C-alpha cells in the first residue's frame, strides 16, 4: 500500500494573475500537493477537495469594480487557514469588512516593508533591520488598488510609506494577506513565507517528493489498466519520455511505444530515441518511418496554423493505423501535464485566448476507442524533469531546450520541403554544439535555428553562390511569457556563422534575431 501523497493539500483560487501557476509550483517545491482552480468554485467543490489551507491569488481586475471576482464566502467559513496575495488580500479585506480604494499611483517593482507587529507568517524572517531593530523585508509589488482599512478583527503586520497595510493578519482565524507577490524570486524571503504558511500554519507534511510521486503513479497505473495493453506515442520529448518510463516500470511489456519519425526531428534524433529507449531501457518500440507522408501532406502549405493542424492530423492517422495492427490494446497513454489541463479548462470556460493551437491536445479524435492514461496530468514541467532523473533518464535529455510539437515544420518558414529540413537540421546542430562547447547552452533558456525561404548572394572561393538564409535565435526568460534576446558574444556568433556557411552546402548567410517577446513570439511561426 503506497502512502497517500495527496493527504495534505492546498487549494489555490485563481483570480487571473500571470504568476498564479508560479504560486502552485512554489507550494509543490515545498513538498505539498496543491491544485489550481478558477475563483468561482462552489462550496460543495471546496468541501469535496477538503483542503488543508487556501491561497487566493493575485489578479488583473480591480476589487473596486462592481462585478469584479470575489472569493466564495465559504472560503472564510471552512475553518482552514487562508492566504491572500495582492488581489487576493484586497478581496479578503473587502469581503470581511475592510475597505479598498483605487490608488492614483500604481506601485510596481521593488519595495521594502517594515514589520510592525508579530505574526506567525513572518516571525524570525527578515532581510535587514531598521535603526530601532524592526525587521525589513525586500518584496515585489504589482498593484493599483490598495487596502485603506483592514477588517476590525485583523492587525497590521507590515507597512511601507505608500502602502499602510502591506501585510495583515487575523492570527485566531489564521487569515493572512500580503500586498506583494511572495511567489516571485524578487521577494527575497517569499519562499520562507510560503513555507511558513503551508508547512507550519496549515501543518502540511512534505509528502510530495519525486520518489513518492513515482510510487503513487505506478500504483495508480496498475490499478487503472490491470493486465491490459497500453499504447503510447513516444516522441523523445520530456513528457512522452517520462510517461514511457513510468508505464514501463508499472506494466513492463504490456506497453507498446509507437515512434513516428515524421522527418521534422533534429539531427540523428530518431536514432538516439531508438537507442536509448529500445536498446538501453528495453522498451517495446514500433518505429514508423513516415517522412514522405508528412512532407507530402505539407506540400504547398504556407500558413503556420494550417501546418500545425496538418502535422497533428497526419500523426493521428499514422498512430491510429499502427494501433489497429496491435491486438487487444485497451488504453492510450498521453504525456499531458498539469499546465495543459489548466489551459484546456481555461479554453472551455472562455477565460483564456488561444495564441497557437496546442499540439499535444489539439487533434486527437473526440470518439476515442480506447481509455486514456495520463500519469503526468497532476505535474508541472519542472516536476516531470525531476521524476525523469529519478527514473534514470539522462540530464541532458531532460533539460534540453523546448522543441515544438510540430518540430521543424514550424521552424522552416512557409512551405516545408525535405531539402529545407535537411539544411536546417545540420545548421541547428552546429549552433547547439557550439553553445555547449562555449558553456553557453545552459545560460540561455532556448536556442534554435530558423530556415528562411529566401536566397541571398554569397562568395565562395572565386565564384558567387545564390543560397539560402538561416537565422539563429537565442532567448533568456523565466517563464516563456516574456523573453529577452540573448546577448551572445560577437566572436561566438562569428564562429557559428563561419561553421554553418563552410560546412552546410546550400546556406550562404546567417543572421541573428534580436527581437524580444513581446512584440515577437519566441518561435517564428
Swiss-Prot record:
Keywords in alphabetical order: ATP-binding, Glutamine amidotransferase, GMP biosynthesis, Ligase, Nucleotide-binding, Purine biosynthesis
Occurrences of domain Glutamine amidotransferase type-1 (ranges): 9-207
Signal sequence annotation: none
One GO CC term on file: cytosol
Q: In which pathway does it act?
A: Purine metabolism; GMP biosynthesis; GMP from XMP (L-Gln route): step 1/1
Pfam families tied to this protein: GATase (PF00117), GMP_synt_C (PF00958), NAD_synthase (PF02540)
Domain GMPS ATP-PPase as annotated: residue spans: 208-400
Q: Active site: which residues?
A: 86 (nucleophile), 181, 183
SUPFAM superfamilies, per this entry? Answer: Adenine nucleotide alpha hydrolases-like, Class I glutamine amidotransferase-like, GMP synthetase C-terminal dimerisation domain
Stated EC number for the protein is 6.3.5.2
Q: Which GO terms describe its molecular function?
A: ATP binding; GMP synthase activity
Which residues take part in binding ATP?
A: 235-241
Disulphide linkage map: none
Function, as annotated, reads: Catalyzes the synthesis of GMP from XMP.
Its quaternary organisation is: Homodimer.
Which protein, by its recorded name, is this? GMP synthase [glutamine-hydrolyzing]
Species assigned in the record: Escherichia coli O17:K52:H18 (strain UMN026 / ExPEC)
* Gene assigned in the entry: guaA
Amino acid at each position: 500500500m503506497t502512502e497517500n501523497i495527496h493527504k495534505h493539500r492546498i487549494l489555490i483560487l485563481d483570480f487571473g494573475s500571470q504568476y498564479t501557476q508560479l504560486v502552485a509550483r512554489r507550494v509543490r517545491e515545498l513538498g505539498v500537493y496543491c491544485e489550481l482552480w478558477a475563483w468561482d468554485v462552489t462550496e460543495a467543490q471546496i468541501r469535496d477537495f477538503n483542503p488543508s489551507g487556501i491561497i487566493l491569488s493575485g489578479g488583473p481586475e480591480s476589487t473596486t469594480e462592481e462585478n469584479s471576482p470575489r472569493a466564495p464566502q465559504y472560503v472564510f467559513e471552512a475553518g482552514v487557514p487562508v492566504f491572500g496575495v495582492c488581489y487576493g488580500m484586497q478581496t479578503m479585506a473587502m469581503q470581511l469588512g475592510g475597505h479598498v480604494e483605487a490608488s492614483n499611483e500604481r506601485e510596481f517593482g521593488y519595495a521594502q516593508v517594515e514589520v510592525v507587529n508579530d505574526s506567525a507568517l513572518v516571525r524570525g524572517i527578515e532581510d535587514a533591520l531598521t535603526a530601532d531593530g524592526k525587521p525589513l523585508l525586500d518584496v515585489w509589488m504589482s498593484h493599483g488598488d490598495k487596502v485603506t482599512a483592514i477588517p476590525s478583527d485583523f492587525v497590521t503586520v507590515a507597512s511601507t510609506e505608500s502602502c499602510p497595510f502591506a501585510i495583515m493578519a487575523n492570527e485566531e482565524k489564521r487569515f493572512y494577506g500580503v500586498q506583494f507577490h511572495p511567489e516571485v524570486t524578487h521577494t527575497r524571503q517569499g519562499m520562507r513565507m510560503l513555507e511558513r504558511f503551508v508547512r507550519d500554519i496549515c501543518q502540511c507534511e512534505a509528502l510530495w517528493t519525486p520518489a513518492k510521486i513515482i510510487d503513487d503513479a505506478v500504483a495508480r497505473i496498475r490499478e487503472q489498466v490491470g493486465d491490459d495493453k497500453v499504447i503510447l506515442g513516444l516522441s523523445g520529448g520530456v513528457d512522452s519520455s517520462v510517461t514511457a518510463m513510468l508505464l514501463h516500470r508499472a506494466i513492463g511489456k504490456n506497453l507498446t511505444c509507437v515512434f513516428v519519425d515524421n522527418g521534422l526531428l533534429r539531427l540523428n534524433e530518431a536514432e538516439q530515441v531508438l537507442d536509448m529507449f529500445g536498446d538501453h531501457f528495453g522498451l517495446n518500440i514500433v518505429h514508423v518511418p513516415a517522412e514522405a507522408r508528412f512532407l507530402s501532406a505539407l506540400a504547398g502549405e504556407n500558413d503556420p496554423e494550417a501546418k500545425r493542424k496538418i502535422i497533428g492530423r497526419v500523426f493521428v492517422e499514422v498512430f491510429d493505423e499502427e494501433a489497429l495492427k496491435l491486438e487487444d490494446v485497451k488504453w492510450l497513454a498521453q504525456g499531458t501535464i498539469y499546465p495543459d489541463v489548466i489551459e484546456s479548462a481555461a479554453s472551455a470556460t472562455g477565460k483564456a485566448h488561444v495564441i497557437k493551437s496546442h499540439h499535444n491536445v489539439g487533434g486527437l479524435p473526440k470518439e476515442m476507442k480506447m481509455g486514456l492514461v495520463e500519469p503526468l496530468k497532476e505535474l508541472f514541467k519542472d516536476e516531470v524533469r525531476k521524476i525523469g532523473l529519478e527514473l534514470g533518464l539522462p540530464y541532458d535529455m531532460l533539460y534540453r531546450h523546448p522543441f515544438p510539437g510540430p518540430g521543424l515544420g514550424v521552424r522552416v518558414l512557409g512551405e516545408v520541403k525535405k531539402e529545407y529540413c535537411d539544411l536546417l537540421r545540420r545548421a541547428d546542430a552546429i549552433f547547439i554544439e557550439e553553445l555547449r562547447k562555449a558553456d553557453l547552452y545552459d545560460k540561455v533558456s532556448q536556442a534554435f535555428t530558423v530556415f528562411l525561404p529566401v536566397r541571398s548572394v554569397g562568395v565562395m572561393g572565386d565564384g558567387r553562390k545564390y543560397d539560402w538564409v538561416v537565422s539563429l535565435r537565442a532567448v533568456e526568460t523565466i517563464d516563456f511569457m516574456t523573453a529577452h534576446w540573448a546577448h551572445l558574444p560577437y566572436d561566438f556568433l562569428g564562429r557559428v556563422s563561419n561553421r554553418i556557411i563552410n560546412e552546410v552546402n546550400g546556406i550562404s548567410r546567417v543572421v541573428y534575431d534580436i527581437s524580444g517577446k513581446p512584440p515577437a513570439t519566441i518561435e517564428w511561426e
